Amino acid sequence: MLELLKKVLKPVAPSGLEEPVAAVIREEVAPYVDSIETDALGNLICVKNGTEANSEKIMLSAHMDHIGYIVTGIEKEGFLRVTNVGGISPTMSLTRHVSFPNGVQGVVVSEVSKDTAMKDLFVDIGAQDKADAETMVQIGDVCVYANDCFQLGANRVASPAMDDRAACALLIRFLQTVGATKQTIIAVFSVQEEVGCRGAKVASFAKAPDKGIAIDVTAWGDTPGTKQPDIKLGEG
């Protein structure tokens, strides 16, 4: 399971550019489902037919996209001005390593400010000036927190893309191991969740399941200073 998780975590796939991770998932699940399609929005929809005629349809959904930044401008010194794609905390972004789909790497830094806001952030990609930066990145390009995946202790893993690639890996493994079911299983690996749950909404209307379950990460209550919700890592 750990190797599968690492494989799914690796692709750079911000909201709207999920194709790299969709390709990995398609390869993993193809032998275990009856049909696979990619809809117009980019959702990867995998169907495992039920054994009963007119069987109940159950949709299981996990999103493939990752929060990130979109380049909004390039300074004369070569620094990239950015804004958020999805929910990002400016203060938690400082000094974070980011990756662009074309392989360019950068670091998020900020203007000197008492209260860091998104408008204060920029990305340093090591460019000498604006012209140099434009050979590597263009306005409108998107980057994500780099896949710095590593193990914590014996059985825990940390990575910026665990939301929601952990659920993608779980759904993949479910399809690989579930066997025959009375119900028809519709597994949706959805796009653009971080910018408004767009993919899951489209897939839900298109497939009209009888029941739906979203698989995602959530807040926690087992670290210093937190009490709610009553959720602990490793306890289900």
Write out the residue ranges for each language-model feature.
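N-terminal hydrophobic/helix-forming segments and targeting peptides
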Residues: 1-236
